[in-house]
């Protein structure tokens, strides 16, 4: 990929797009871990902790692409809205948030992840990067649907 990105103004755009997705993945990784620790159903706990690891892997893949292209050093902070979202989820769990409430919070976070990937894929990106983002997006969409379905299932119990 580095040959496709060397020395153009397009580099800055690609870098900005990737950093936005990476920040969102950082938020997702932390959010899944935090919420996963507070869920009561074992199936959901396992899913959330595995999903946290998956988001860390996605982030590492994108960071590697940036490093290979000689671009940015990536922060470990995530976004401000992600930090607020995690804090809200933590507060809900401490105040007696049940699994349904925690899954609602997780779904909101997944909506942000879906948006980050959609926005990224609207840009002119090198084909290998577009393919990587498309594969990751597919997983994020499936994860969102899983979280939503489990949230909805808890309403009917």
Residue ranges and their predicted role:
Residues 2, 8, 43-46, 53, ...:
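Charge-rich, acidic-biased intrinsically disordered regions
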Residues 2-10, 14, 20, 27, ...:
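Long, non-catalytic architectural segments outside compact domain cores
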Residues 6-40, 99-124:
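Alpha-helical bundle segments that constitute or directly flank the non-heme di-iron/ferroxidase center
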Residues 13-21, 42-60, 99-103, 128-142:
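Alpha-helical scaffold segments that form or flank carboxylate-/histidine-based iron centers
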Residues 21, 28, 35, 58, ...:
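Amphipathic alpha-helices that form helix-helix packing interfaces
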Residues 44-80, 147-150:
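Conserved alpha-helical segments that form or flank metal/cofactor-binding pockets of metalloenzymes
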Residues 61-101, 105-114:
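Carboxylate-rich helix-loop segments that flank metal/cofactor sites and access channels
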Residues 106-157:
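Preference for long, well-ordered alpha-helical segments
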């Amino acid at each position: 990929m580095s040959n496709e990105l060397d020395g153009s103004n397009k580099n800055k755009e690609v870098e900005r797009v990737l950093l936005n997705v990476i920040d969102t993945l950082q938020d997702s990784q932390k959010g899944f871990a935090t919420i996963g620790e507070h869920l009561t159903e074992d199936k959901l706990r396992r899913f959330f902790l595995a999903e946290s690891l998956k988001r860390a892997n996605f982030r590492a893949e994108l960071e590697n692409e940036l490093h290979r292209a000689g671009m940015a050093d990536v922060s470990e902070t995530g976004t401000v809205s992600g930090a607020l979202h995690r804090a809200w989820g933590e507060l809900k769990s401490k105040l007696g948030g049940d699994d349904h409430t925690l899954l609602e919070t997780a779904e909101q976070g997944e909506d942000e992840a879906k948006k980050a990937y959609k926005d990224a894929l609207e840009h002119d990106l090198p084909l290998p990067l577009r393919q990587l983002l498309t594969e990751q997006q597919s997983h994020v969409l499936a994860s969102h649907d899983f979280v939503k379905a489990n949230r909805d299932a808890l309403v009917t119990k």
